Structures are given as C-alpha cells and as structure tokens.
Swiss-Prot record:
Coiled coil: none annotated. GO terms for biological process: defense response to Gram-positive bacterium; killing of cells of another organism; peptidoglycan catabolic process. Belongs to the glycosyl hydrolase 23 family. It catalyses: Hydrolysis of (1->4)-beta-linkages between N-acetylmuramic acid and N-acetyl-D-glucosamine residues in a peptidoglycan and between N-acetyl-D-glucosamine residues in chitodextrins. Its EC number is 3.2.1.17. One of its GO terms (molecular function) is lysozyme activity. This is Lysozyme g. Disulfide bonds join 4-60, 18-29. The active site is at residues 73, 86.
Amino acid sequence: RTDCYGNVNRIDTTGASCKTAKPEGLSYCGVSASKKIAERDLQAMDRYKTIIKKVGEKLCVEPAVIAGIISRESHAGKVLKNGWGDRGNGFGLMQVDKRSHKPQGTWNGEVHITQGTTILINFIKTIQKKFPSWTKDQQLKGGISAYNAGAGNVRSYARMDIGTTHDDYANDVVARAQYYKQHGY
C-alpha cells in the first residue's frame, strides 16, 4: 500500500508559477510547465526509482509524491554539489535542512529518502490535526506545502502555497508527482 496519506491523482493543482517556470527556460507556466520539468528530470530520477518505490511502500506514501519532491528540491540530484544544495543547508535528493534536522545516510541513498519521507509524513500528520475537516487528499497537499515552508504557513486550502518558494510549492510538486505516477512511480 502506498495510499495511507491520500492519492496525488485526486488533488487539484495549478502547477508551476511563472517564477518557477521562467528560470527553467520555459515561456509558459502551470501544470504543463511542471510536467515538462518533471520530464527533464525523469532520466536522472530513474536511477533512484527502485529506492523511491521501496521507501514509498515501506512508509505507505506514493512513490510519485517522493519523486515530485525530489524533482522540485534537487532536479533528481542534478543541481547538487557533493550532495548539498541551498547554500550548503539542504542535504540530499530531498534537501533535508541541516538547520532543522540532522541529515542521515548518503545524499542519494535509502536512509536519506526514508528520512525525507518521514519528515513529509510528520508534516502531513500535523496538517491532519490542524485541518481535521479536510479530505485526506487535501491534507496530503497541505503536508507537501508544509515540507517547504512549515505547517504554520498553511492557513487555508486555497492559499496554502502563499509563503512557499515562488508561492507554488505544493501545486508544482503535485503536478510533477502526477507526471511521475504516469511513468511507473
């Protein structure tokens, strides 16, 4: 089972903002931009597919969601230097922030992906408590947003991404995850 926290295909999304799409060299924004970026990352992502699926099954999170976060955070490792990104604070494929967590494992290994996914699950659980009337799928989206900007930043369903990087984090990750789900994740 990988659907304990909702199903990414049931989540509405506006996709990438122009602030996210433009630096990628795209002249368009939205879901199609997210899917294009995810497609560009697919070859690199496929190197980690087995581990991503194993962790997803172990922790009952859709592997596609993990892949969506990895694409957004590190372009499947392509932008990292010795496993580090984000001015030396973010570690690994999932960019675990060393200011909030002690990074575990190698930057691209199972231990790291397990740590990042566990951090995501903890945010989903916090959002479940904060917004008990939301559907499971809405809570999943809220947890994805919180992975970027913290649970305190999630104030309403419609505006959860305001305050995330480029104000589009969960919407972009969800659209990328939908792409990865179509590609066997």
